[in-house]
């Protein structure tokens, strides 16, 4: 466990260092200044690391978390917490982890592996016992961090997000902004010089909402029990093992400290496996070693002694050892000045209001200053958004890489052990300091550097400098060639070139596993403790990708500002600056073949969001126009590749998946600058259309509040997306009704009633459906922020439309003897009518047919730059070969499970084509490719077919037997060549039905003269007369019904009008084929904010109910 086990060591072996405290008492200052009860004029300011505190902010280990989360209960808890802090004169500032942190990637990989095992244990427990799992298996519900962030913003609690190195930014932000203490649970904070360190795991709010308690860690007590001076903590942390120098690289050193006579020494020679000593044993042994170091400034001598047993990559380990010391030295160094906005009148330790620093400096406590001093601050590294230090808060973290120890050991006053520190100078708890300390022992603590300005503080990145350099590349747009040894967007443009090749050097998998890199000459032949996982991260985990397209500087500035303020989904900044994201594990049954992994299910959403973020459609359209004007062929567009780190069935998190960004084919999405910063009504329309297109829900009914209330738009979009999955059926009829019924139930806003609701037997499938749905909500938040937030964040929050426990109860009721819809709505006819309307809106324009074969996995796309082995298989839209296919990936495999659906005209054609086997992940124009992609031979229609040439029948063939599943016979299949239909493609069988679910990235429309006529005809007809009758009936239906149309099944799955699509961006040079689909916003002249369909965002009755919920929760705690 390395340094991460130090926090648990404090809890178990240093009970005197863990003191319970009541935060309201600290805020009142009852024991400050000789015990005088003088109310402070400034609140007690606490910084909370949300990364360690999510389960406490959620409300604790309630058993409902396994069902997808009870978000209204969480909302009530946070409302009570905000009220308690406001009434108790406490100011909370919650800091979320928004950093990619490639330097800690190996820690994330290990954590994902453990959580994946926990998810399987949870599923097995629910399947066997039908009860909630124990709280020790707590796995945060999907999207929990973002829901907590939105809820805190709602209750006016200040939030922020880290951008590069979460731990360093939290420490720096705490010191620079005058916080009294830090609420967290991480060993990195315990080993840094934090003024007052409180436990995030022990944070509890009483039932009456008036007492907020936690525990304070007294690090001077920890140092006393270890008999180690705190100024040696940086070396101590570096030798325990950390994200820079992992404990696997220190295994030989740790075993050598124990010696051959130790009772555990026999464990180290077990069959050439990497066995690490127990964490508590290592901590004591390393503390003894560090205490006996004579000269802490001679790092070379220390490193030589530490790695004397190492037989491979010793020089690299020494470098990383020095970097680790520099990292912890920088975070442990106290600030020499404090921001002036903090220096306000507050009762000080002298019994009178005065100017006091946020924490008592070590000089005031007679604690000798640390000898691990940093050199002058390194040159500033430009931030991605512009000038250094600008943003919602300044950073002044020094660069740890070049740090060395301050030698001057002759006048060094430190002592090796803790016992030599004067007793009167040792740290005392905040609430126990009742007597003044002699101020003459230190310099003036109230002196403020006059040259200090918060906006111009130094800004440098953390130990991992990838983000800033990558952003600089994107701003400049330089066409720097990407190399095999560099990162995709970071070609030698970093402050520390060593970081590029070392990749923050760390191991990446659990002990005992075997990797190819662990074999060969680097391992040696007789190494007693093989360091199997000591290769640098980038060499065996990362994959080099081409540089990202340039992004406008103003867009990056806006992205950085919103990211730091906690106002934007963190994936967006990661994609724009680094081109990669990390996807967390959710509760999934890996033995269940019916439900796909969430990472694969919503990958098409992310692909289109990537295309929106990099403005693929507009940039490629401009390039094509320029080539057309110059009478040249359109250039070959290089793909935009995003790396996705994820762990699911059949996929290890140790290597990323390369995913291509896609652009919409139906319309040209404007560039990101216009989406985010445009003020025109047309821009607002485009934001909404881009979001709906990403979610495959670009239908008029989605914007009609009579069918879909605006606060339920995200719910309906996610459900519609799940229904359209081209693989096995995800949602059944009763499951879809259960989702809709619980969203309209009055119980959704009554968390007290839901707490009393009893679930007889948890449904394992319901738990997985909840996880899949919340994963879709997570991606909807991502898409909404990327498209410029067309839906206000207040209407995206899941407490408006989902409760896991309520969904479980509705699902059990719906699955039991096929309960009628009116009973599912508790006998409320109006609710049942609303559910019916919402279901029709979700299924609008979709036609379902039962498939004959299970959909196979499509092969990976043949992209340039990479070997085929670098692409793991994945679902989602796969780019067909250039200029070949007119195949589709339709919504098939359901057999009409959602009620009666109208399938006329092209929908009849689609239904017949799907029933006859022309349904798969994709299909090409040639039969061999089609059969290969569908995993089997196409079935022959039962009534046979005939071949016509120039209108004359020249051949017949017999049919096959009736297919399984009770389906009727297929209509007679006709293949016409030449004749009246001359000019269309050969054979009606290959009618280009436009795909519903996805489109390849480099697949561009090729118009032809009679495209509309072909798409309007059924692919199977007995004669030309049937075709004419079909067209006539089609045209009549299009006039009589607003929801039916003559066009093809457009890519968004909507009924279409047979007329050319209007020019979306006012351009006339688009040479693509006319679109025949009716979009929800197919004309920019349609207003978005003046339209009553969209103006209803602020007038929903659900909003008033949600406001009443907040008042009820606040009043309940009084």
Curated annotation (Swiss-Prot):
One of its GO terms (cellular component) is plasma membrane. Residues 481-502, 1026-1037 have a biased composition (Basic and acidic residues). Residues 374-533, 921-945, 1025-1102 are annotated as: Disordered. The modification Phosphothreonine is found at residue 655. GO terms for molecular function: RNA binding. It is a peripheral membrane protein. Widely expressed. In gastric mucosa, detected in the bottom region of the foveolar epithelium (at protein level). Residues 405-420, 435-447, 503-514, 924-936, 1076-1101 have a biased composition (Polar residues). Transmembrane segments: none annotated. Residues 339-405 are annotated as: Interaction with YES1, SRC and FYN. Arg-982 is dimethylated, probably to asymmetric dimethylarginine. The modification Phosphoserine is found at residues 960, 1023, 1044-1045, 1048. Residues 376-396, 1038-1051 have a biased composition (Low complexity). Residues 829-1118 are annotated as: RNA binding. The modification Omega-N-methylarginine is found at residues 873, 884, 886, 982, 986. Disulfide bonds: none annotated. It is found in: Cytoplasm; Cell membrane. It is linked to May play a role in the progression of scirrhous-type gastric cancer by supporting cancer cell survival during oxidative stress. Interacts with PURA. Interacts with SRC family protein kinases YES1, SRC and FYN. Upon tyrosine phosphorylation, interacts with PIK3R1. Interacts with IGF2BP1/IMP-1 in an RNA-dependent manner. Component of the oxidative stress-induced survival signaling. May regulate the activation of SRC family protein kinases. May act as a scaffolding protein enabling SRC family protein kinases to phosphorylate and activate PI3-kinase. Binds IGF2 RNA and promotes the production of IGF2 protein. Belongs to the constitutive coactivator of PPAR-gamma family. This is Constitutive coactivator of PPAR-gamma-like protein 1. The gene is FAM120A.
